[in-house]
A protein has these predicted regions:
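Short acidic/glycine-rich loops and adjacent helix/strand connectors
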Residues: 1-232
Length: 232
């Protein structure tokens, strides 16, 4: 089976970061970032990782019309078949049929995935658990996603979302608030999570940070943003 994955989704109206493409052919995997091919990080003139995808096809010796499943993140804008018909017939020539049959082909070959759920899937599939609970706190995730975090369970190869947070005051945005306060941009604050395991707890700083947040059964998570003169 051959699977091709793109981030971001073609024709998505929102700006994204770290464009990338992955191609899977049986047990072989090609995955790369567009910026490493073009040497331009987060290139604003590019709307999807075209060069990386073509490089993956070349490395695995396949043609676009051999792909069994195309995987895209769910776009913020409505899905317009005419746009995707252009994409699959002109840009990559993955579809060679009649325009009247395109919708059927599209429904069979294209899959849109939940951004936050993809993080939960990576953790669950990479573990040894046959069933587990998951909590994904990705803040905005894809910028068009209003959910701060999701909670659910994984069982029988199915992910079931039990709760979604759409408010502002939650632990994911608290993380963003703190990283913004020390100078990390919205696209880069995830790097602090990767570095956190190498740091040391500083009791004085921990005490000050705890003053900014309140957790209660009645109100959940609340945090004070005015401490650093940041209100949005």
């Amino acid at each position: 089976m051959i699977i091709a994955s793109l981030y971001p989704c073609p024709f998505d109206i929102q700006d994204r970061h770290e464009f990338n493409a992955s191609v899977l052919k049986d047990e072989k995997i090609f995955s790369y970032e567009e910026g490493k091919v073009t040497t331009v990080k987060n290139d604003g003139t590019s709307k999807f990782p075209e060069r990386t995808l073509m490089l993956g096809f070349k490395e695995l010796d396949i043609l676009p019309d051999q792909v069994d499943k195309w995987v895209f993140p769910t776009p913020k804008s409505d899905i317009k078949l005419k746009d995707y018909h252009l994409f699959f017939t002109w840009f990559f020539k993955a579809y060679n049929g009649q325009i009247d049959d395109f919708e059927k082909w599209f429904n069979e070959h294209v899959e849109f995935v939940d951004h936050q759920l993809s993080h939960a899937a990576l953790a669950s599939y990479g573990s040894t658990f046959s069933e587990c609970a998951f909590l994904c706190m990705d803040g905005g995730g894809d910028f068009g996603d209003p959910r701060g975090y999701i909670f659910g369970d994984y069982k029988d190869n199915q992910f079931n979302i039990k709760y979604e947070s759409t408010g502002y005051d939650h632990i994911a945005n608290y993380h963003s608030f703190l990283t913004d306060s020390i100078g990390f941009s919205g696209d880069d604050n995830g790097k602090t999570s990767g570095l956190a395991s190498y740091g040391k707890v500083q009791p004085k700083l921990k005490k000050e940070i705890k003053k900014l947040i309140n957790v209660s059964k009645e109100e959940g998570v609340k945090f004070e943003r005015k401490r650093f003169n940041i209100t949005n």
